């Protein structure tokens, strides 16, 4: 078994392939996000499964119509992403589809009694909002002591070369997390370990400063019964629906941290008063129905059947 660190795209790709039959992908070249002519196979149906945001370097070849014309279909993981690519690159809509992300259904979800310290969790990369969360935690520590923020964050998921080149940029941030009251820094963890941690957590706290195209970590958290507190940046409103506490994005990170702290203070109080119980039941049922692989795999099979049939006609 491959135990090397994996990011969300790698996890989703692995989960998809494990649920498809060989015949589902017969004659299909499924390209993960990177837009480059070297990845095109002329004798196959070329599908770009696009997880990247429209502004990422590896997506910029979408400006090249020669590349776009060689791709048979583009699959986007949210309607937000589809529309951003449509606006920036004038993508051909007739070969564009939206198939949202998914996660395996959670079982044996156990939350500790909320009379103890509430367990908050952050599971994203450090540059997507950890510095804001750290500052918000420092602010919140001045007002209350009934919570604990567990941080699962590292540069490991992008490989050893990236870690060597960029990892030291975040050592100071990680050290501050380790030395901040009511923060517990875990660093890197496998997806299985992350899933166990979110199933035991009460709140998922993500003051995102990155335009997510979907956000697998949020899908996992909401499926596991965490109330999510995040920003309304990128595709997060689409991913979270009406279940999360949404903070209006603010480019001034100090002001964003203050805003996030204020919102989180209210959420903690409401959670202790059992104000989210009904919502969380609805939320878990919703994500089990609409964001589980039990549902999504049928959409993928239908899509792959469609593209193979079109090729034959």
Please tell me what each predicted stretch does.
Residues 188, 196-201:
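Short alpha-helical donor nucleotide-sugar binding micro-motif in glycosyltransferases
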Residues 199-213:
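Acidic donor-binding loop of glycosyltransferase active sites
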Residues 112-129, 134-137, 141, 150:
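Conserved donor-binding/catalytic core segment of Leloir-type glycosyltransferases
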Residues 227-230:
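Short hydrophobic beta-strand element within catalytic cores of glycosyltransferases
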Residues 7-11, 251, 255, 272-312:
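A charged, aromatic-enriched C-terminal amphipathic alpha-helix characteristic of glycosyltransferases
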Residues 163-192:
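Nucleotide-activated donor-binding/catalytic signature segment of Leloir-type glycosyltransferases, i.e.
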Residues 1-35:
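N-terminal pre-catalytic "stem/leader" segment of glycosyltransferase-like enzymes
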């Amino acid at each position: 078994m491959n135990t090397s660190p994996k990011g969300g795209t790698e996890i989703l790709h692995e989960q998809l392939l494990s649920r498809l039959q060989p015949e589902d992908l017969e004659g299909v070249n499924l390209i993960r996000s990177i837009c480059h002519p070297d990845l095109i196979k002329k004798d196959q149906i070329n599908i770009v499964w696009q997880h990247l945001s429209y502004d990422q370097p590896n997506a910029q070849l979408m400006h090249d119509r020669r590349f776009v014309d060689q791709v048979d279909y583009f699959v986007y993981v949210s309607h937000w992403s589809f529309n951003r690519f449509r606006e920036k690159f004038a993508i051909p809509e007739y070969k564009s589809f939206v198939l949202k992300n998914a996660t395996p259904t959670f079982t044996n979800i156990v939350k500790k009694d909320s009379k103890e310290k509430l367990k908050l969790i952050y599971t994203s990369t450090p540059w997507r909002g950890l510095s804001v969360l750290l500052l918000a935690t420092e602010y919140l520590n001045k007002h209350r002591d009934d919570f604990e923020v567990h941080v699962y964050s590292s540069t490991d998921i992008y490989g050893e070369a990236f870690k060597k080149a960029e990892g030291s940029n975040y050592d100071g941030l990680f050290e501050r997390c380790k030395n901040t009251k009511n923060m517990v820094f875990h660093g890197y963890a496998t997806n299985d370990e992350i899933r166990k941690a979110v199933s035991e957590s009460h709140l998922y706290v993500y003051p995102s400063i990155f335009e997510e195209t979907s956000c697998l970590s949020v899908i996992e958290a909401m499926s596991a019964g965490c109330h999510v507190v995040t920003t309304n940046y990128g595709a997060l409103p689409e991913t979270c629906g009406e279940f999360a506490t949404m903070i209006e994005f603010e480019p001034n990170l100090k002001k964003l941290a203050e805003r996030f702290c204020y919102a989180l203070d209210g959420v903690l109080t409401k959670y202790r008063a059992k104000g989210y119980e009904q919502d969380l039941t609805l939320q878990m049922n919703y994500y089990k129905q609409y964001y589980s692989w039990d549902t999504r795999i049928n959409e993928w099979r239908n899509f792959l059947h469609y593209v193979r049939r079109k090729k034959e006609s």
